[in-house]
Amino acid sequence: MATKAVCVLKGDGPVQGTIHFEAKGDTVVVTGSITGLTEGDHGFHVHQFGDNTQGCTSAGPHFNPLSKKHGGPKDEERHVGDLGNVTADKNGVAIVDIVDPLISLSGEYSIIGRTMVVHEKPDDLGRGGNEESTKTGNAGSRLACGVIGIAK
């Protein structure tokens, strides 16, 4: 059983990063940094497929094995892959430090082999008042992505 995973984020533009995942008890700790972002919040999600053959678009929708509506990471109603937002500073750097109780590195909610995506816009956490908000959080285009793999 995997206890650690890693993801290297790359896109067509300047956005890149490395994200580490570590199982700790009933949670997964997500840490790392992303550079090349515009200042402010950016949606940060695990998407269903580990397919990046067509860039980040072939990663499919948010990882949602429970068939729920989109929400924030602290909401009862959320996709498993909904990790909310990362916040970039004025230099375009986002430091990631998330503890999530729903994602896993093993079992039916495992994120291994799926794609991590950082988005262009803030995730409205399903509170945007339109249908797209309940699917994607209106987070916009996919700036960078990478497949999550088992780490040592």
Swiss-Prot record:
Zn(2+) binds at H62, H70, H79, D82. Keywords: Acetylation, Antioxidant, Copper, Cytoplasm, Disulfide bond, Lipoprotein, Metal-binding, Nucleus, Oxidoreductase, Palmitate, Phosphoprotein, Zinc. The modification N6-succinyllysine is found at K4, K10, K90, K121, K135. One of its GO terms (biological process) is response to axon injury. Its main location: cytoplasm. The keyword Thylakoid does not apply. The modification Phosphoserine is found at S104, S106. Its cofactor is Cu cation; Zn(2+). It holds the Pfam family Sod_Cu. Palmitoylation helps nuclear targeting and decreases catalytic activity. Succinylation, adjacent to copper catalytic site, probably inhibits activity. Desuccinylation by SIRT5 enhances activity. PROSITE patterns: SOD_CU_ZN_1, SOD_CU_ZN_2. GO terms for molecular function: copper ion binding; protein homodimerization activity; protein phosphatase 2B binding; protein-folding chaperone binding; superoxide dismutase activity; ubiquitin-protein transferase activity; zinc ion binding. It catalyses: 2 superoxide + 2 H(+) = H2O2 + O2. Belongs to the Cu-Zn superoxide dismutase family. Chemical modification of Arg-142 reduces activity by 80-90%. Homodimer; non-disulfide-linked. Heterodimer with SOD1. The heterodimer CCS:SOD1 interacts with SLC31A1; this heterotrimer is Cu(1+)-mediated and its maintenance is regulated through SOD1 activation. This is Superoxide dismutase [Cu-Zn].
